[in-house]
């Protein structure tokens, strides 16, 4: 089970959960919820929440950089040797996809970063 599956299960559980202590009871007389001091958000508390990173921000995720796929027969695989060039189809040179498990996170171009391989993001994949 991936971390994404666990997260999705947690979200579904939270969506199904209704806390009776957070239910608002409306007063017919003044049209406002009873049992609450104010309906206005506390600006100071909201600012503190923005300053603090979410609790899960330090969670490390294993991501995969994919630059193409190919299919070889077992015989072709056995014949591989140093210097063999394999043709990768379905992707342009320098293009790669950043994935978490099977979920695509972003796409980009492979770049040189001071002698090391890097990925310059060209498109983030939005979740719907």
From Swiss-Prot:
Functional note: Component of the type III secretion system, which is required for effector protein delivery, parasitism, and pathogenicity. Probably participates in the formation of a C-ring-like assembly along with HrcQa.
Protein location: Cytoplasm
Gene Ontology CC: one annotated term: bacterial-type flagellum basal body
Protein origin, superkingdom: Bacteria
Name of one Pfam family that matches: FliMN_C
Annotated region described as Dimer-dimer interface, given as residue ranges: 78-81
Organism name: Pseudomonas savastanoi pv. phaseolicola
GO biological-process terms attached to the record: bacterial-type flagellum-dependent cell motility; chemotaxis
InterPro entries, alphabetized: FliN-like_C, FliN_T3SS_HrcQb, SpoA-like_sf
Composition bias, Acidic residues: 1-21
Subunit structure: Homotetramer. The four monomers assemble into two tightly bound homodimers. Interacts with HrcQa.
Signal peptide boundaries: none
Domain notes: The HrcQb-C domain interacts with the HrcQa C-terminal domain.
Stretches the record annotates as HrcQb-C: 50-128
Coiled coil region boundaries: none
Region called Disordered, residue ranges: 1-57
Positions of the record's site feature: Dimer-dimer interface: 87, 112, 114, 120
Key words, A-Z: Cytoplasm, Virulence
Homology family: Belongs to the FliN/MopA/SpaO family.
GO molecular function annotation: cytoskeletal motor activity
Protein name: Type III secretion protein HrcQb
